[in-house]
Amino acid sequence: MLHSPIPTKADPMIFEAAADRAARAIPPVWPLMSSVAVNPFLGQAGETLAKAGARLARVAGIAITMPRHWYQQKIDTGEISDADLLAALACAPADLRPIDLAALKAAAALNPPRPQALASVADLAARASGVDWPGLLTERLGAWMAGYFDEGQALWAAPRGKSAYGAWRAVATHDLTPEIAGLRGFARHVSEAPETAMAVIARVCTRLDLPVEALETYFHQMLMSLGGWGQYARYKLWQAELAGGSDQTITDLLAIRLIWEEALFLRYGDQIGEAWAHVRVAHAAPVVATPDLMIDAILQDAAERAAQRELARILAGNAPQIHETRPLVQAAFCIDVRSEVFRRALESLNPQIQTLGFAGFFGLAASHRRFASDVAESRFPVLLNPALKSRAGGPYRAEDAEPQRIKARAKRAWGRFKLAAVSSFAFVEATGPIYVGKLLSDALGLPHASAPNDPAPQLDPALDLASRVKAAGAVLRAMSLTTGFARLVLLAGHGANTVNNPHASGLHCGACGGYSGEVNARLLAALLNDPDVRAGLTETGMAIPQDTLFLAALHDTTTDRVTLYADDHPCQTHEADIAQARTWLADAGRLARGERALRLPRAADETSISKRSRDWSETRPEWALAGCKAFIAAPRSRTATKNLEGRAFLHDYDWTQDKSFSTLELILTAPVIVASWISLQYYGSTVAPEAFGGGNKLLHNVTGGIGVVEGNGGLLRAGLPWQSVHDGQNYMHEPLRLSVCLEAPVAAISEVLGRHDGVRALFDNGWLHLFTLNEEGSIAWRYNGGLQWVPIDDTEDAEQRSKLKVAV
């Protein structure tokens, strides 16, 4: 195959375009303080699983499906049936799939070698010299990036004001470590490098004689070799573009990594030239799936079809009888899968308790400042920009916050003193005895963490009445809650209480940007209790009964305890309702804890659950969203009483009330995308923990205040820690792509997909599965790609299956 050499005076756009594509192939990672789940395959959404597998095998040496023995075990136990295998086989391209079921089963019994990435110049230099150049550059770059990206943790703060490339050059020209290891003249090489990152990239590519076709996957490989540091730089680009700007940090990191490649090539080029020529050709070749990768994709599809069969069986069960009487209480929870267990427990206590599911930020994208804080917390999905600003309110004067500010400053100063370059060495000896009491208290798990209880939040600046009415109406319509209001309506955000857990924010509400959801719930409750807003809603045809009280709550997913913010809206007429609600919530918590205890290691019963949240040695305080496999948007009556085992996102939706299908469009473009990020993060952290997992919690050290490394340095580890998906013996997350089930007309769903190419790509390329439910709640149609649908029919034979075209 002929490849296009880079001209001596190449158009800079060639390099810029390739660098930009490589950067967008990297998933972003949010800092620990507000970490959220991210789809690690975000940059491969336009490819099928098999093709993405080929790409990631080339650039990172990872497999993005499970080892074949995992599927073989499911085949042996009958969990994956022959019908599942046949259906998945029929969907695969004929030129790559096994010829028949027997051949597929024979392939499933084999264990092909795991993929190997193409060698970098550093890899080839290591083989030629015996020096671990990949390890050395990882160590040196990791140490520098920890300082450069530091958010206040480093002993010595890195100089500010320079680009990443400029800051690195200032350090690298004085770092003799590479030269001591054998890379003579490295500091001078760096000092003589071009002044801009793009000029560096152009020079290195020319010197390495890279064909134009090789640039994208080679650049992708270089950024993947930086681990979480590259992902954090991608986050900076994401945030900048969300605000309408741009950021060059990830391009700078690419240039830095390429300077190492160039220096090593100049040093060892004579010894590695032939091997490097083969690598160049391999990078320039088109990315295509191999028969082995297609077999893996077929087996993955079959495992998902088996799970979908089980989901269809559960949903086809008898629906509960709908009570026409007014509910005693309604409770709206986040769609988070952890709410499913609690909602089912709560509804079991009284048939007149009704629960609903809605995105946990309750439709209010607020940038919030807590009491006495100058930090603006983005309490909304990371896909959005803030639409509102809020702050902790209450009947206090501005000067009342000053003592809290002084206390916070003193705490920060004390923290800096503990970490300072000089004082840190004497800190333990000088102040250690002061901490004896705290150490004993923490070791015994004595502190009982309380729910956040700032003064009730308020919008600042306040919205005018018309805007408040519009916002309230939009939220209620999106919740499909426009009639049939109970006397007491609870709006329950969720959060988690854990100790000694750098990933604590990952247990909070993803829809709230990695924060707990009480602020959004309290803001909405205040909005819906406003008499003027209610009067305005009545004029629009949405009448809320005068005796309905909205009350915010916070569901602690670690302990299944619920805090009611009753003091926000004192109401003597509802004291009995609130007291009864507290009793029901406490009883539901006990039931939910009992069910969750069955899955948690060393959890004897429901009473042991609370202790886990206060145990600083506990690496698994809760399973969070491990096990998630389905997203269901339908009336609650379709899923009520059906045990979905805490594995389904549940969003209330009544398409008959959605005349323009604007709510359907909102669901497909927001909650479904957030759920897909969560599902695919768990998937990636399970199938490829070396690239997309957070590593071992027992080895974690927080670095820069933004992430964790294993040990004392190296690559930032992004993704979920191993303890979040595995209990030490078995996987607690089953890596399955999310099955999205919508009760809505097929034509309406297709119309929405036709308007949103990015959403459609996720379904067309198989990163998500899509189904419709009928009016009985049973799965009726499967999306077949290309805006085509096929009916679900258990009697479907192999000939009919051969017509299916869903991507694998």
Swiss-Prot record:
Keyword Cell inner membrane (UniProt): yes
Primary location recorded for the protein, binned into one broad class: membrane
Highest rank taxon of the organism: Bacteria
Keyword tags: Cell inner membrane, Cell membrane, Membrane, Metal-binding, Transport, Zinc
GO terms for cellular component: plasma membrane
Required cofactor(s): Zn(2+)
Residues holding Zn(2+): C334, D336, H494, C509
PANTHER family on file: INORGANIC CARBON TRANSPORTER SUBUNIT DABA-RELATED, UPF0753 PROTEIN AQ_863
Function: Part of an energy-coupled inorganic carbon pump.
Name under which the protein is recorded: Probable inorganic carbon transporter subunit DabA
Annotated organism of origin: Allorhizobium ampelinum (strain ATCC BAA-846 / DSM 112012 / S4)
Gene giving rise to this polypeptide: dabA
